[in-house]
Regions:
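Glycoside hydrolase catalytic-domain context in secreted enzymes
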Residues: 1-214
Length: 214
């Protein structure tokens, strides 16, 4: 049957009926507690799996009903003016890495099969400005790229075995992230050994010619 890949679970299963709502990611990060966050993610995954079982049994495989959860957001919250900073675990790359790993492990479980499929987003250097995200070119030095923006994604791949990675809307150093050979092949696949699937942010492929003009 057809399967819709879009489901959200940043701090609870979203947009698919009643579910437990936990504090936003920035609030959960303030606990500095990896085990507690992993438990939160386990609850989210259990509810997502229960909803999926019920809805698929009824033949409902529409948007927000699947097991590919587009969470966590492991971007770095550098500028308080960024309107989506509350979705992140804050400004520290190390803390974001640790909490991202815990959340992913909680969502995916430790059984033979995935409980749900987590998605580390938005790869990479995606921290505003929100209004220009479809056309913005983020210029990051190699030092800043590897010490600030990539560690959480690297940990998600190498330590947590994240099943999916979402490309960002913006360009990074001239390349649209969702089509970047540097990010998606050289770093993600060849250097880190990622074996899962890559997903674009919503309609980001259209931005290649509509706003990035590449």
């Amino acid at each position: 049957p057809a399967y819709n890949w879009w489901n959200e679970a940043l701090h609870g299963v979203a947009r698919a009926g009643t579910a437990t709502m936990f504090p936003q990611a920035i609030g959960l990060a303030a606990m500095f507690d990896e085990e507690y966050l992993k438990t939160v993610a386990e609850v989210i995954a259990t509810e997502a799996r229960a909803k999926y079982n019920m809805q698929s049994a009824q033949g409902d495989r529409d948007i927000y009903k699947g097991l590919t959860l587009w969470s966590p957001n492991v971007n770095i919250f550098r500028d308080p003016r960024w309107g989506r900073g509350h979705e992140t675990y804050g400004e520290d790359p190390y803390l974001t890495s640790r909490l991202g790993v815990a959340f992913i492990k909680g969502l995916q479980g430790d059984g033979e099969y995935l409980k749900t499929a987590a998605c580390a987003k938005h790869f990479a250097v995606h921290s505003g400005p929100e209004g220009k995200r479809h056309e913005f070119d983020a210029h990051a030095s190699q030092k800043d790229l590897w010490e600030t923006y990539l560690p959480a994604f690297e940990a998600a791949v190498k330590e947590a075995g994240v099943e999916s990675v979402m490309g960002a809307y913006n360009r990074t150093n001239g390349e649209p992230c969702c089509g970047s050979k540097t990010l998606l092949k050289d770093i993600l696949r060849d250097t880190w050994g990622f074996e899962g699937h890559v997903v674009s942010d919503c309609w980001a492929i259209c931005d290649f010619h509509q706003t990035h003009h590449v």
